[in-house]
Amino acid sequence: SSTDANRKNFAKTAITFMKDWGFDGIDVDWEYPADATQASNMVLLLKEVRSQLDAYAAQYAPGYHFLLTIAAPAGKDNYSKLRLADLGQVLDYINLMAYDYAGSFSPLTGHDANLFANPSNPNATPFNTDSAVKDYIKGGVPANKIVLGMPIYGRSFQNTAGIGQTYNGVGGGGGGSTGSWEAGIWDYKALPKAGATIQYDSVAKGYYSYNAGTKELISFDTPDMINTKVAYLKSLGLGGSMFWEASADKKGADSLIGTSHRALGGLDTTQNLLSYPQLT
């Protein structure tokens, strides 16, 4: 993204990929601009993609608006480098990755996707969603362009006495407990595990399961948590919810996506574009 030629080529090839697969827009996941120069180049890149999307639409899909979105960080060290007001102008939505607040990379156990900080147990809440959302809005992003991301998985900590405490391992390495697709990460449909009881931190707004026998703690969202998050995002006028990722969900009443759908009152009903005359 450091040169105009590179930005033009990125936009051109991304749009080719979009039309060849019949997508309705482009989502850019840049993790993460490391300094002011990269943050500026990110804005220039997105403006070039927006320009080429509009040019393609004008020629081949008159009246249609292709979406341009990004996956955005919820950690202040990362989002404080971004040009938030500029992003709020050029983008249709900012999909806030409001998860992975704690995991194998953490010194202590913690919530994976809590809404708020817990001053009485700060070790359990090194990050929180509310601070990130408020900072994005304060930085110039329209609230209705912020889409709140929610995890459909849990993060495990082993050999621990509880949340915000020391642990030893997350699974794997011959320890018996591994994960659904990565050591220490469990699909929501596999939770809670047998023998574990679900606990709720009413200050941080975060659920986790704990097995006193195996000393395993897993932080994950429940349907009740999704209802709480939807009420929160509606109270701030945010743009909706998004999830990572659908294959990990449960069916029926326990579905996290289904819970969000019911709480929000429906899905996005924007019509898909069905005609791509330049299809290669």
Model-derived features with residue positions:
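Receiver (REC) domain switch/active-site residues of two-component response regulators
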Residues: 24, 92, 239
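Short, acidic/polar
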Residues: 2-20, 76-87, 129-133, 220-234
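Short acidic, glycine/proline-enriched helix-loop-strand junctions
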Residues: 37-40, 44-46, 51, 55-58, ...
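Glycan-binding loop/region signatures in secreted carbohydrate-active enzymes
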Residues: 102-105, 109-120, 150-232, 258-280
